[in-house]
């Protein structure tokens, strides 16, 4: 990053509608697969759209890094819980890719209650020349069969097939907020407000409850689970975050029920900063292990923090995302914006972190140089192949020409969901119903 931030450019954006936004079109999750060749998005209408990276060609060297629609399918439908008289939204809360084992790809998608496993396969050949069936698959009249032939495979237009493999239901009383695939490639966990369940990918009718923070009396409830994730290398370790701002690292080798954590990561509160909003803004909305497994990244309302697994007392790094909003917490509380759940992401080398903000802004922080940049994802400022200009929010006093004042920020335009390519400087940004894909100009010019 550093000097290179000004040369970050947009490749293209996927715009679903130019005139108005329907609620169903709003993107609710973004996820690269383990190679970065595929990118999946889920929306509030229960749809999953998969994008595939274009192969680099000699004729069009600038196409390197571009993504095209690969497949679209309906993952979840709206349902109704007759026992509780509750509607279950079709909105896709999370998508997680499984490590690729063969030519097919697999992913998990979840709404509030049900997790589904999908298999994505390609077909570019079809069998022809059957002896007992015609081209449409109907049985021939045997009296007309005078000779035998060997069936052959003929090329055909590429067809992407998405098929449901398994449905994991009835595991959660409360709304599922996160799913995470284990490094053993056989199990995954799902978390709701009060419980975390461990599933085997091959078994749909039962799961093991590994965390349960539900008190005997619900009036004694003081915190809820907000996010959880498995360690990238140690299949026995996982972390979950809470609405009180704490992180609990658990070891499944210690006990079947991990109510007693191995480590508690919590930053002591500064009494001088105590206010009515302190607990709300300290709630962790996302937690991500670094690729190395040494660090954890958390996002609360105003900051992103980096934690070392070997130091529980406080984070080793704290970055202010939009500290200028501290004076506006009252109005943000009244509009419910203070409860927005922003995600965070690491780059492939764990040296840069990214998270979203309001006004379609997103922030990047370089951990080595300590430099940061604010960029904007919008149709107005982002033409294909245009260089993204850093933006600056002005709190008061003198304003530069391109500065934007805090009072003119649009809080309906928010970047909640972001993803970073696992190896390259390619990022995906969800802005309401638009998906933007950016890549580093320096990175692309090297090829």
UniProtKB/Swiss-Prot annotation:
SMART domains: WD40. One of its GO terms (molecular function) is protein phosphatase regulator activity. The keyword Repeat applies. Keywords: Repeat, WD repeat. WD repeats lie at residues 22-61, 87-128, 171-209, 220-260, 279-317, 334-375, 410-446. InterPro entries: PP2A_PR55, PP2A_PR55_CS, WD40/YVTN_repeat-like_dom_sf, WD40_repeat_dom_sf, WD40_rpt. The keyword Repeat applies. GO terms for cellular component: protein phosphatase type 2A complex. PROSITE patterns: PR55_1, PR55_2. It comes from the Eukaryota. Belongs to the phosphatase 2A regulatory subunit B family. PP2A consists of a common heterodimeric core enzyme, composed of a 36 kDa catalytic subunit (subunit C) and a 65 kDa constant regulatory subunit (PR65 or subunit A), that associates with a variety of regulatory subunits. Proteins that associate with the core dimer include three families of regulatory subunits B (the R2/B/PR55/B55, R3/B''/PR72/PR130/PR59 and R5/B'/B56 families), the 48 kDa variable regulatory subunit, viral proteins, and cell signaling molecules. Interacts with IER5. The B regulatory subunit might modulate substrate selectivity and catalytic activity, and might also direct the localization of the catalytic enzyme to a particular subcellular compartment. This is Serine/threonine-protein phosphatase 2A 55 kDa regulatory subunit B gamma isoform. It comes from Mus musculus (Mouse). The gene is Ppp2r2c.
